[in-house]
Amino acid sequence: LFSYFCRKNLKYMMSNTDIPLILISNDDGYMAPGINALVDMLAPTGVRLLVCAPDGPRSGYSCAFSSELPLRLKPISRKDNVEIWACNGTPVDCVKLAIDRILGGKMPDMVIGGINHGDNSTVNNHYSGTMGIAKEGCMKYIPSVAFSSCYYNHDADLSPLAPYVRAIVAKVLDGGLPRGVC
């Protein structure tokens, strides 16, 4: 992806470097296979990935945020172009804390929710923490998408999604999304 971006001489907002920064979260927790599959799909492309996800499952939290719970961030790992943090809050808390605390108020080039284990189509998207992540990014005018798998089984093979995920991410980073659309 990164070499493609360089060849295209893109004119999108960059976060301190010429390498795009993507903020990733989910509602299944930072150890869930879906978010790790997403990182594995995108890390080889050369983009920088900041993962800030709940410290455990938070499915069904939609756009909820914590108003009374003291929130904590815990660094998990940092390797090459991937940095992983855990948060004791909701998926939306993760996005807010990543931008405000980890990035010091700087906006990432893109926000991604997922890969969710389970369908988020139709009415389900109103309850989904994965969709809440994309909505939070959208409200901050950051190009945002969410990926979900119809497979609820955490052992599901998500590798067939890789070409689609990479193509969608490249398209969004290349041309953005209309303001307020996720």
Where in this protein do the model-derived segments appear?
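Short glycine-rich anion-binding loops that position phosphate/pyrophosphate groups of nucleotides
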Residues: 28, 57, 90-91, 116-119
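Glycine/threonine-rich flexible loop motifs
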Residues: 119-128
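Short acidic, Gly/Ser-rich segments with clustered Asp/Glu that frequently serve as metal-coordination loops
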Residues: 28-36
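Short, Asp-centered acidic motifs that coordinate Mg2+ and/or phosphate
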Residues: 110
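Glycine-rich, Lys/Arg-enriched anion-binding loops that position phosphate/diphosphate groups
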Residues: 138-182
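Hydrophobic/aromatic ligand-binding patch that stacks against planar heteroaromatic rings
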Residues: 133-137
